[in-house]
Amino acid sequence: MMILVFWSNYPYEPVCLASHRNNMEASVPKYKKHLPQLGMQKEMEQDVKRFGQAAWATAIPRLEKLKLMLAQETLQLMRAKELCLNHKRAEIQGKMEDLPEQEKNINVVDELAIQFYEIQLELYEVKFEILKNKEILLTTQLDSLERLIKDEI
């Protein structure tokens, strides 16, 4: 049985995935390095504003590397959340299909439908975050390439 656990932006908020339904709540702090990277990136961005672009020319590659690492980890976290939400959505669909005909009263079906749509909304938010982080990855890589070409000329 394989258990994968990913950490969100907050130190005590794990997002868990497991190959077995009973182990969905397991947690291991695998991605704790995400928080220091976020802090370092924000500090460096503030320092660039404070001291100017020319003073930070040598630190730009490091800042780009931090942005890439942070975007990659956040992307991995969002993909894990997406998998978890897809699993929850499939469980709700299974519950709706498995309801015996005599138990298919309106209240139970409505409750399951509400849960399904709430999870669907969360999925849309996660997919939006995935797209945002892909954009960050691509723009950072583009900026890095432009800087390297400019330095070569």
Swiss-Prot record:
Keywords: Coiled coil. Residues 113-151 form a coiled coil. InterPro entries: JMY/WHAMM. Pfam families: JMY (PF15871). This is Putative WASP homolog-associated protein with actin, membranes and microtubules-like protein 1.
